[in-house]
């Protein structure tokens, strides 16, 4: 609660304030076709000079913005967000229509919830492990349904 009060007084150097500042700078500095981390960092520094209240985001400009979709939008642009949504939608539809098993939905829901406040898809090993797990679950349920 204190973090939100600080944020409302333009102090983003708190845990919640920094996250909200990261979300804001990500949305304000994205490029529709994507951009490098260096270009994004440059834009964030320029934005912070104009809006010093966003300084809580500065320690994170070289890594990620603590939200999967905003981080994807800020570096991979609209096509990256569209592909991310398409991938999650395909898994969701498969889980509902074909597998009819809750485990895939639970995994997908967990990824979406955690992705709202942190970045899961940022490093290559994590999404690889997640998608391999989903593929293995799908194969397992297919074998079970064939028996």
Residue ranges and their predicted role:
Residues 27, 42, 74, 83-85, ...:
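Short, function-defining helix-loop hinge/capping sites that tune catalysis or transport
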Residues 75-111:
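Hydrophobic transmembrane alpha-helices and their immediate junctions
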Residues 65-68, 73-80, 121-130:
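Membrane-interface micro-motifs in multi-pass membrane enzymes
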Residues 45, 49, 92, 133:
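Short Asp/Glu-rich motifs
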Residues 104-116, 120-147:
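Transmembrane alpha-helices of multi-pass inner-membrane enzymes
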Residues 8-76:
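Long extracytoplasmic/lumenal interhelical loops at the membrane interface
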């Amino acid at each position: 609660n204190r973090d939100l009060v600080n944020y409302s007084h333009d102090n983003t150097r708190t845990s919640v304030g920094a996250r909200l500042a990261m979300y804001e700078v990500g949305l304000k500095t994205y490029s529709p076709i994507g951009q490098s981390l260096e270009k994004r960092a440059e834009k964030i520094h320029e934005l912070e000079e104009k809006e010093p209240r966003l300084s809580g985001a500065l320690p994170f400009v070289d890594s990620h913005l603590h939200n999967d979709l905003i981080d994807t939008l800020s570096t991979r642009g609209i096509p990256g967000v569209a592909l991310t949504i398409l991938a999650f939608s395909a898994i969701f539809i498969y889980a509902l229509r074909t597998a009819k098993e809750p485990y895939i939905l639970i995994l997908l829901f967990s990824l979406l919830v955690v992705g709202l406040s942190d970045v899961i898809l940022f490093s290559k090993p994590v999404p690889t492990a997640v998608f391999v797990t989903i593929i293995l679950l799908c194969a397992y349920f297919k074998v079970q349904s064939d028996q």
